[in-house]
Each structure stands twice: as structure tokens, then as C-alpha cells.
Amino acid sequence: SHDPVVAAALQAKTGKINGNFDCNTYLDIAADSTGATVYTAVKTAKEKLGASSNHAAVFWPKGAVGEKIYCLSAMAAAETAATDAANGDVPYESPSNKDLKITATVLDDGTEVALDQEQANLLNGQGVITAINANGFKLWGNNTAAYPSTTDPKDRWLAVRRFFDWDGNNFILTYFQKVDKPGNKRLIQSIVDSQNIIGNGYVARDYCAGYRLEFHAEENPITDLLDGKLTTHTYLAPYIPAEKIVNIREYDTAALEAALTGGGE
């Protein structure tokens, strides 16, 4: 996936598979002279790779277990699958800050790359996911390859994008049986009611903050109805990863005074 031609093909194939389904792809920036050998060169390497899809995530450098070197995208894919499995196969949680079973982050030739958190955050801000050593190596980053060109939550955040795609694919699989049924009010209401029950379950389990599906007349003009097309509209709000947790501290003089004087005269 570090080859621009391959990366372009992978990104092109993530949307409308068989005309219906969406997915995500994980790409690597080459960890050698054809890509980037230092973190300051990663932004340019990402641009040369052509990684810009909201359905793609980009990784740099590589991970090593002893002398064995692995593409970071492969390790991230395994971490993503493990995170999903731990959450009932619902992709609402980011794989970032999860343990990676590696002993070092390296270039292709095995040269160690030791990124501190600020350097890793810089890469995250360029739409690149990496790994840091924080009491053990952890995957680090939440943004898709489309960031920072887009800040739309459903296109920027990998976990949100994956939830959108998963929900959209499930909708197709669930209601495919309804295709070619009479397009009457009963059909529309059955889809709306059934999907809202499913969505309410997501909210109750804290998979997302809100979920509702509606049928709007203005999105279903007579030309569409005559063409056999019905359109529903889903409003959903997966939770955003808590990427920054800030604690404000100040000195409590009243507490000191009360402790020493009892608050009296």
C-alpha cells in the first residue's frame, strides 16, 4: 500500500462495493528513502502517496518484534479488529491508545524511530497515525487520511467514519428483503419503525449519542416515486474520541485558610 498506484486503487475500491457497500482501507507511508525516514518528511510523503480519502487511514513508520518487521497498517488492522471484537463487533471505539505487541518502531532497514508524544501529535495533525512508547507501545492517532483537508466529524474521525459505514452496510443487509415490495405507506413506516428501534438500542448501549431515521416528503419528489425510488434519512451521532483531556488547576487559598485558622477570626 506504500505504492501510490496501489494506494489509489485501494482508496477507489472502498466505496459502493457491488454498488452498495462501503469499507475502509489502511495505507502505509514507505519507511525508507522513497517515503519518509524522519517524521518531518511524513507530510510530504503522504501527499506523494496520494492518501486523501475519508475511507482511508495512513500509518508511519513500521513496527518490530525483535528482528521481525511488520507494516504498521497490518498491526493497526489487527488492533482494530480486536477492539471491535471486544465491543460486540460494533465499531464505535477507536483503536488508538491500545497496546501494540511490538518492541520498537523502525524504518525498513531496522533503524529505530523513537517518537515522543509531541512529534506523534504533529503526525496526527497531518492525518497520519503512528505509535508511541507510553508504558509500552501503543497505536496513536484518530484521524482519517482526509484530515486536515476536512473537519466534518464523519469524514475526519476514523471511529466515526467506520461507524457510519457499518451502520449503512447493516441497513442495506437488513432491508434488502424489502426491495420490490409495494412502495406504500406501510412499507415506509415499517422501515422507519424497525430502524429506529435498532437505533434506540445503539443509544441505550452508549454506542452513539443519538440515532433516528425519518422519511421526508421533500427528499422524495414525485419523479423519484414514479421511478420506484424511496429515500430515508438517518441522523446519527457517534461519540467523538476524547483526544484531549484537560485538567485546570488553581491554588485554593480558602482551603488553606480554613485548615490553619478554622475559618474563624
What name fits each language-model region?
Residues 1-174, 211, 216:
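A glycine- and small-residue-enriched flexible loop/hinge signal that marks low-structured segments
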